[in-house]
Amino acid sequence: MKRILLMVFRNLFFVPYGWFKLCWYASHAERYSEEQRYQLLKYVDNRAVKGGNLVIDGHGMENIPKENGFIFFPNHQGLFDVLAIIQVCPVPFSVVAKKELTNVPFLKQVFACMKAFMIDRDDVKQSMQVIINVIKEVKAGRNYLIFAEGTRSKDGNHPQEFKGGSFKAATKS
């Protein structure tokens, strides 16, 4: 929690500008290429990482495919996972996230900017439609990030049980 407060206070004067720009990109996503939107997210991410005095070390970057059309399936250990992945990933990607996160003001704009798919875990039909849409987009060359556990792990660095539906997109695309 201290790191989050440190990020906010160190970027206090940047927040209104960053918020406005993020909202603009999110509401006019069709005007900007995926690369331009990703560069904005990387810029905001860099500000947050520097503000929080975080050091992010990426390993295995050579394993990321050179051509687009892949899915990441990392473990979700904490609040900084997505910051770290955006920081080290050289290519743009989108995410599949639970729809409850659209109630969080900043995340709502980030997901809109990424053109993320929001999944309703209580609606099986909608969840399957999201998976079908992800399959189509991966085949078309778009990259995705899916936390296969479905939620953040609260007990440290121990992976939880993976949700079966998350791998359907990978096996079918």
Indicate residue ranges for each PLM-predicted region.
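Soluble catalytic domains of membrane acyltransferases
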Residues: 55-173
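Membrane-anchoring hydrophobic helices of lipid-metabolizing enzymes
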Residues: 1-70
